[in-house]
Swiss-Prot record:
<dbReference type="GO" id="GO:0005524">
    <property type="term" value="F:ATP binding"/>
</dbReference>
<protein>
    <recommendedName>
        <fullName>Homoserine kinase</fullName>
        <ecNumber>2.7.1.39</ecNumber>
    </recommendedName>
</protein>
<keyword id="KW-0791">Threonine biosynthesis</keyword>
<comment type="similarity">
    <text>Belongs to the pseudomonas-type ThrB family.</text>
</comment>
<keyword id="KW-0067">ATP-binding</keyword>
<dbReference type="Pfam" id="PF01636">
    <property type="entry name" value="APH"/>
</dbReference>
<dbReference type="InterPro" id="IPR005280">
    <property type="entry name" value="Homoserine_kinase_II"/>
</dbReference>
<dbReference type="GO" id="GO:0004413">
    <property type="term" value="F:homoserine kinase activity"/>
</dbReference>
<dbReference type="InterPro" id="IPR002575">
    <property type="entry name" value="Aminoglycoside_PTrfase"/>
</dbReference>
<dbReference type="InterPro" id="IPR050249">
    <property type="entry name" value="Pseudomonas-type_ThrB"/>
</dbReference>
<dbReference type="InterPro" id="IPR011009">
    <property type="entry name" value="Kinase-like_dom_sf"/>
</dbReference>
<keyword id="KW-0808">Transferase</keyword>
<keyword id="KW-0418">Kinase</keyword>
<keyword id="KW-0547">Nucleotide-binding</keyword>
<dbReference type="GO" id="GO:0009088">
    <property type="term" value="P:threonine biosynthetic process"/>
</dbReference>
<comment type="pathway">
    <text>Amino-acid biosynthesis; L-threonine biosynthesis; L-threonine from L-aspartate: step 4/5.</text>
</comment>
<keyword id="KW-0028">Amino-acid biosynthesis</keyword>
Length: 319
């Protein structure tokens, strides 16, 4: 979440005339994140988050907003899109598709403990179950086809060692078979900065704009690679097990998922290594923006490749 497209107080006042939310009191840009423009919007009716979508088209976005509504109505702590006076959750502001959603309680954590990992593992499992009844098709815009294309873009910038690792990982993914794994709607970006913790509870899961249909294990791997990683980019076994045990208690993990676990952690690390390399070498213009360090996921990928047996050994206590 960053500010690529500037919105003035007066523009926001005018836009809010299409909603029944009262008078605008405050408008504040949110600098964290890397894809869309976001503002905190405070009116005399409450606090909301405004998102202007920098990459998605207006045709793609209703599915994401419908998914958030679907999950919120089933008890998942996620933002609820606010409909305007015409009954639509999606509008346009400064030439960009735009939406308002409810603002949730809590804050993101820099140093999650095992109890926080267990809490997010439980919520992710509940989200996967709730998402099973969401019928709209949503393809993974950061899937294998995107990874192959992005690898070709960033490869010229890599040193010889990382170029070899990139090629080896692409070859691994070419033969990595996930067809037998349980599939469904996934968040696909469940980092710490996309979760608001309210004490030891999950106050909210935000930023559903990479959500898609894919292997549920991929969603778990993306989250574990951020929530359960030590300072040296190795996995913390205590936090991993807390996360997986809590998830497994809600949606039992399968033997096929256990066998695929080390490989899925590699795929998840590769996806974010590539996106961070792409953001570094091909940045978007913006007012309050920042690119995240790709070296973090480079190290996570190296560990995932080297530590396959140790990764397999840290799993749920019962299948």
């Amino acid at each position: 979440m960053s500010v690529f497209t500037t919105v003035s107080f007066e523009q926001m006042q005018q836009w809010l005339k299409g909603y029944d939310l009262g008078e605008l009191l405050d408008l504040q840009g949110i600098a964290s994140g890397i894809t869309n423009t976001n503002y905190f919007v405070t009116t005399d009716n409450g606090r909301y988050v405004l998102t202007l979508f920098e990459e998605h088209s207006a045709e793609e976005l209703p599915n994401f907003l419908d998914l958030m509504t679907h999950l919120a109505e089933r008890g998942i702590p996620c933002p609820h899109p606010v409909k305007n006076n015409a009954g639509r959750a999606l509008g346009e502001l400064n030439g960009k598709p735009a939406a308002l959603v409810s603002c949730l309680a809590g804050r993101s954590l820099d140093n999650p403990m095992p109890q926080h990992c267990a809490a997010i593992g439980e919520v992710l499992a509940r989200m996967h179950i709730a998402g099973a009844s969401f019928k709209a098709g949503m393809s993974n815009l950061r899937g294998q086809e995107w990874r192959i294309a992005t690898a070709a873009k960033v490869a010229p910038f890599l040193d010889e060692e990382n170029h070899r690792m990139l090629d080896a990982q692409l070859e691994f993914e070419r033969t990595f078979d996930t067809r037998r794994l349980p599939r469904g709607v996934i968040h696909a970006d469940l980092f710490r900065d996309n979760v608001l913790m309210d004490g030891d509870k999950v106050g909210g899961v935000i930023d559903f704009y990479y959500a898609c249909h894919d292997a549920l294990l991929y969603d778990i791997a993306i989250a574990v690679n951020d929530w359960c990683v030590n300072a040296d980019c190795t996995l913390d076994a205590v936090r991993v097990r807390a996360f997986l045990d809590a998830y497994h208690a809600i949606r039992p993990l399968t033997g096929e998922e256990h066998a695929a676990w080390p490989g899925m952690l590699r795929v998840a690390a590769m996806r974010f290594w590539l996106s961070r390399l792409n953001d570094l070498y091909f940045p978007q213009a913006g007012e309050l923006t920042h690119a995240k360090d790709p070296a973090y996921f480079e190290r996570i990928l190296k560990h995932s490749i080297a530590a396959r047996e140790q990764i397999l050994a840290v799993w749920v206590n019962a299948h």
